[in-house]
């Protein structure tokens, strides 16, 4: 009898953990227009000027835990936005596009966040570009060529089309399957671990959601 109740409890706990449910309008919302042309499973919009975006990368390390707890092969497409249409943000957007094309994201992401928000060593477009060149060991000629290339322009054009289509109005914004946006601010931040676990649970729930 004792063994029966232990088995029942294990089954019950297993059933509970695999059937977590979240509420539309609370933990997540539908995007304004659903993307229909086979969007990546996860799209993240961020800004190097956004303190909360910095927290997601540095403090919570969300992408690391997505790959660790969901799948190491899960594709995450990341875009740096220019919501203010300012020249400095435009250059940040371009630098990020170059980084993605050249697979240099990990070399520049945290250092540029820190240079802008923590150390305040990146305050102008020239020292932004110089910092990027130092971090990536790229020369200025190559950077100018790549940053003005068709590939980079196409990357930014596609990004801005998505932003307009879904009516992006804030960062950070995590879009799941081109249908849902996570409401980050509703997730309680009692502890780093609590926030990470809840965030990952919501992503997993939306990735598995049928409709």
From Swiss-Prot:
CDD domains, per this entry?
DsbA_DsbA
Q: Does the keyword Signal apply?
A: yes
**Signal sequence, start to end:** 1-19
Matching entries from InterPro entries are given as: DsbA/DsbL, Thiol_disulfide_DsbA, Thioredoxin-like_sf
Source organism superkingdom: Bacteria
Q: Which UniProt keywords apply?
A: Disulfide bond, Redox-active center, Signal
Which cysteines link up through disulfide bonds?
A: 50-53
Q: Which family does it belong to?
A: Belongs to the thioredoxin family. DsbA subfamily.
PANTHER family for the chain? THIOL:DISULFIDE INTERCHANGE PROTEIN DSBA
Briefly state the protein's biological role.
Involved in disulfide-bond formation. Acts by transferring its disulfide bond to other proteins.
Protein name, entry field: Thiol:disulfide interchange protein DsbA
- In its UniProt entry, the species of origin is given as Buchnera aphidicola subsp. Baizongia pistaciae (strain Bp)
- What gene is this protein a product of? dsbA
């Amino acid at each position: 009898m004792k063994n029966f109740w232990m088995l029942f409890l294990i089954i019950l706990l297993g059933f509970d953990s695999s059937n977590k449910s979240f509420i539309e309008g609370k933990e997540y919302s539908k995007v304004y227009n659903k993307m229909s042309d086979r969007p990546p499973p996860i799209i993240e919009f961020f800004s190097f000027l956004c303190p909360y975006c910095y927290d997601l990368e540095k403090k919570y390390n969300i992408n690391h835990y997505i790959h660790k707890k969901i799948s190491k092969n899960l594709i995450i497409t990341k875009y740096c936005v220019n919501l203010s249409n300012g020249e400095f943000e435009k250059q940040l957007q371009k630098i990020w596009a170059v980084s993605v094309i050249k697979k240099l994201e990990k070399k520049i992401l945290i250092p540029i966040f820190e240079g802008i928000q923590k150390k305040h060593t990146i305050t102008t477009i020239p020292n932004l570009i110089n910092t990027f060149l130092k971090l990536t060991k790229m020369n200025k000629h190559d950077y100018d060529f790549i940053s003005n290339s068709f590939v980079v322009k196409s990357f930014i054009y596609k990004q801005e089309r998505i932003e307009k289509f879904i009516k992006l109005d804030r960062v950070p914004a995590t879009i799941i399957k081109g249908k849902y946006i996570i409401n980050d601010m509703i997730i309680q931040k009692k502890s780093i671990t609590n926030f990470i676990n809840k965030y990952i649970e919501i992503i997993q729930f939306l990735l598995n959601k049928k409709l």
